[in-house]
Amino acid sequence: MIEWIIRRSVANRFLVMMGALFLSIWGTWTIINTPVDALPDLSDVQVIIKTSYPGQAPQIVENQVTYPLTTTMLSVPGAKTVRGFSQFGDSYVYVIFEDGTDLYWARSRVLEYLNQVQGKLPAGVSSEIGPDATGVGWIFEYALVDRSGKHDLSELRSLQDWFLKFELKTIPNVAEVASVGGVVKQYQIQVNPVKLSQYGISLPEVKQALESSNQEAGGSSVEIAEAEYMVRASGYLQSIDDFNNIVLKTGENGVPVYLRDVARVQTGPEMRRGIAELNGQGEVAGGVVILRSGKNARDVITAVRDKLETLKASLPEGVEIVTTYDRSQLIDRAIDNLSSKLLEEFFVVAIVCALFLWHVRSALVAIISLPLGLCIAFIVMHFQGLNANIMSLGGIAIAVGAMVDAAIVMIENAHKRLEEWDHRHPGEQIDNVTRWKVITDASVEVGPALFISLLIITLSFIPIFTLEGQEGRLFGPLAFTKTYSMAGAAALAIIVIPILMGFWIRGKIPAETSNPLNRVLIKAYHPLLLRVLHWPKTTLLVAALSIFTVVWPLSQVGGEFLPKINEGDLLYMPSTLPGVSPAEAAALLQTTDKLIKSVPEVASVFGKTGKAETATDSAPLEMVETTIQLKPEDQWRPGMTIDKIIDELDRTVRLPGLANLWVPPIRNRIDMLSTGIKSPIGIKVSGTVLSDIDATAQSIEAVAKTVPGVVSVLAERLEGGRYIDIDINREKASRYGMTVGDVQLFVSSAIGGAMVGETVEGVARYPINIRYPQDYRNSPQALKQMPILTPMKQQITLGDVADINVVSGPTMLKTENARPASWIYVDARGRDMVSVVNDIKTAISEKVKLRPGTSVAFSGQFELLEHANKKLKLMVPMTVMIIFILLYLAFRRVDEALLILMSLPFALVGGIWFLYWQGFHMSVATGTGFIALAGVAAEFGVVMLMYLRHAIEAHPELSRKETFTPEGLDEALYHGAVLRVRPKAMTVAVIIAGLLPILWGTGAGSEVMSRIAAPMIGGMITAPLLSLFIIPAAYKLIWLRRHKKSVS
């Protein structure tokens, strides 16, 4: 089949070259128009349900809202995890779906089940699903800063809510624009209970008057003088005077009682659950642009920047928009870095080919296969919908060296056959027809084996394709693009390369020995191979023993899910104890921001504590998220690295009650979405009794702090909140004609504040709140004395119908699959993640006694690593079996297929030692490198075995298979190995040359790519030894055993 393809391609070379030209043009177009991003979209398919229950404590929100929702959503088809978050006034339910679920199908199913549960929710409470985006979609953040001092925080927030937000939402593929920080203007009506009693007016009557005084009505239309006039009755409240003039009742003497007679009306801030601060200089308002799932981040960010630039002219005097986070900077750095690495690889590979072949036109044949293979890869990426990012370009980058292997072997074989023709026809000039025939025959000779070897390299990545979840989404693009590149190289090797050789390999072909580099290689290899063939069993024994040398480096190499990716920005997410007030949270935020900004490498600090106004952010008030933009590296102090900056920040920001955590923004949001844990290592304690969960979590926190390498650990306090419990006495309430519901309505309105509508001021809408003044609700004793006017117009106090006590309780409740849980955040440095987790597990088993009904599970990146390892342990053996079948189909002998397969562990020795020398940990990235190395090593073995078989078949004594001498066998093996050392040395050289720029790279994404390249580079030390020495020695023993009766 392969022979037929090669011969038909040569016969129709004009059509083939036209097709190659078309591919190059089409591929160039796709390269230019392929969407770009920093990382693949790693987010799970999720649907967020947000339910507001204003003024309600977390326990009430959990019991009445979150619990019904989570238990119902567990039945949604395809849902794998349901997480619930109950906090003050809000419920968030995250429904995480299985891989491959269509997002919009998932949203429709969640809506279907949401309709079913709506009747179980409290009256007046309705749920809504969040935008078709995730927390990973936070691609652009900005702050509104007043440089003039003329605009307060409420004006800045109004500017964001009613102007910028709407303008930015018009940009295609912006899912949502979330407001953060500032203060929301609110009309506050502080009712004096004493005056209410004097006038005999109850609080519900005031609410009713407010609601009826803030309406508009239509009166249809009237016809006047042949014209139609539409009738409207305007009644919206638009000023404080409008509020003051609301009539509550009319006295017996006809004198009206106005709202101003019983209440004070003012504007003030709505209760704050999110605060923003910039550079330690004070609070600001801001916004977050959230990308729709699966869309082009850089295009959207460009459109956002352009829109903001046009809106600057419309801003009030002195107001400035300051960019505080821009993901396109990372995208550009990552793409530029890998693009330059690809160009470096192309250049280095070209030099290697020219040096070995000593023939420029022949080198061009090999080199031209690289851009053509790149075009093929991008064309397939275009149809698959893959964007260009660190991982997809990285797949092409690690394939560059192997892509030219087939071309190198074919060119070298053509050189060899043309050289042989010259020896057989001394003094003759080869004609064009004969030259095409020789080149075609040379291609046919090695084509099938090369195609099989490239197919093995391609299939070796099957385990990567089977990865699921976050690791599958991360390494899937790399596996796809590497496969496309290798598949393109395989197709080019049997279709285009023979034709290019026919066109360009002309004139006098330099003999192999005329190249000084080749002479050195042959001279060095010749005596070593003779000794190996003289002592084949000793050679194999030494090789087998060398495999055991990896035991020690393996024991020293730690484990991790992925290396930390330097995104160019940082996210500061300290863990704080619960129960902090908004004022204290704002002060703490400004203090930490000011300390962070004092580090010279920091460009800007945008701090946020609490949540932004979006369903994608469920952060409680005590949760700090500070975005740190770093200056370009050329502006850093000499010798500074990202790790040194983090260490300095950690030393600088040392405040009581804070457990510091410094993480990359995208990486952190991905982890929080996938596992819910914001730190690299997380521990989830689940149970049924909150006090037991809390006690267990705090015990684990104490023992985890003693583990070497742990720099911070903090367990969430489920019982850390402070509650004022109002326990209504039903009997006492009934004596005053009040029900429990009446008292609860009074508590929620007078103390918590009741929302009684909103004002309409152009496009702006501002809430109206009614409650008692602060003096009546600033202590438990004041609450007891709070006046109540009963339905029978009796004056009593709250203490007459209820007992008031101060107790502790949860500030936030978390559940996973409807089971309450407490999360413990662990940050470790100086040790690998797997070792730290194993030590924590040991400490927990020895020192922590679990309460009945509680369970402990490790999460975070460790959970992802375990999931990936479990899948690889299943798929790697299956892939090895597939490779064995391919080898058998190639050689039609079990012993020869086993020879290549059994020798692969030796090729991995160099990779393991090199990994240890570089100080890298075992991870999914290094595992990917080892899988790629195994495929390349198998290719080396196939090519060497092919040369040895050809040499034996061409030997006059061995080809008869009657009798032969061991010397004759050694001579044939010598010709197959030594006289073909050039192509083997070239393949090693081009692979190493292609990988070194990746290993030495320092730009965005280099952390992952260097881990993939390291095992392959180390393996290029032992894999050639496998091909050059072990395969010939083992093949000699196999041949002798197979023909032992013919030995003379």
Curated annotation (Swiss-Prot):
Keywords in alphabetical order: Antiport, Cell inner membrane, Cell membrane, Membrane, Plasmid, Transmembrane, Transmembrane helix, Transport
InterPro entries according to UniProt: AcrB_DN_DC_subdom, Acrflvin-R, CusA-like
Residue spans crossing the bilayer: 14-34, 125-145, 338-358, 363-383, 391-411, 446-466, 485-505, 539-559, 737-757, 871-891, 897-917, 928-948, 985-1005, 1012-1032
Classification via Gene3D superfamilies: Multidrug efflux transporter AcrB pore domain, Multidrug efflux transporter AcrB pore domain like, Multidrug efflux transporter AcrB TolC docking domain, DN and DC subdomains, Multidrug efflux transporter AcrB transmembrane domain
Membrane topology: Multi-pass membrane protein
Pfam family membership, one: ACR_tran
A single cellular component GO annotation: plasma membrane
UniProt keyword annotation of Transmembrane present: yes
Molecular function via GO: antiporter activity; monoatomic cation transmembrane transporter activity; xenobiotic transmembrane transporter activity
Compartments, record wording: Cell inner membrane
Record family assignment: Belongs to the resistance-nodulation-cell division (RND) (TC 2.A.6) family.
Purpose of the protein: Component of the sil cation-efflux system that confers resistance to silver. May be part of a three-component cation/proton antiporter.
NCBIfam families per record: 2A0601
Entry protein name: Putative cation efflux system protein SilA
Native species: Salmonella typhimurium
